[in-house]
């Protein structure tokens, strides 16, 4: 059956669900899981069903040697389980031989597998909400190297996971590794535009005043979507790399070359999946500023800022960047949330739609492509 993206409390329970819906949060994903849970509880109460929470308490305690185990603290027999994991949350720590050790994506993925094992054979069905796809940046083989994301997906399929829900995958074609498993890649385009207009209500999307620029060839699809729904023009950069050297695990970028029309006097919107160190984004923004761009808005679904915020503070102070738009789909350092130039987008309601749809075996097509909502958002401004 199909479902409108605007879920009413009545439609929430008017169809029989697959099984009782329950949420499990891996360590480090408590914030997003809690926000998803609030939407589900609110919808349930509006439909006359009293439910304090859908979250099952769990833990992944560590032994002093660093070994761990997954522990689920309530019965899950016959339940439709949704496990939320944030592989990018480096702020979670554990003791290892009396040293404070920060969790890596590998540690988070191991915890996910532990919790899947803890419910295996008892839950009716297990789905995984992994906003930032584990190993997603290692999605293809160029030389003799591992294919981490593909192997991880196959491992989850072998463990009995039925559905994977991710957001803005670095390359969604990685789902080819598990063609028989349900894999949904959602783009928070509507949520970003809504927050953008809340931040700047007077922002004009007229093609004479606004343009979209892709920071590289890999980000073209997401930027093409923005330019198509906004009705503005699209430019792009491509990276010239030195393939004779490897620095920090990648071939260093020699230069960014721009392809597109003039950006002079325009507001430029740059969308990418990740801001890691941010060097590429800042170099692209500086290049566009030199070409006469009036304002530059950077958007990244996963604002990691692995090298800190100082360079971005300076870029904003120097007038190179106007602001940066990110989401709460991964951990954000507390300092980032205090910056005036940062816009934090809440995507938890969008994720809650997926939980509801899958729990009722409803179509998620209208959720994945929110074109109607974007059209209404833009129409209401006129």
Residue ranges and their predicted role:
Residues 1-382:
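PRPP-associated nucleotide enzymes
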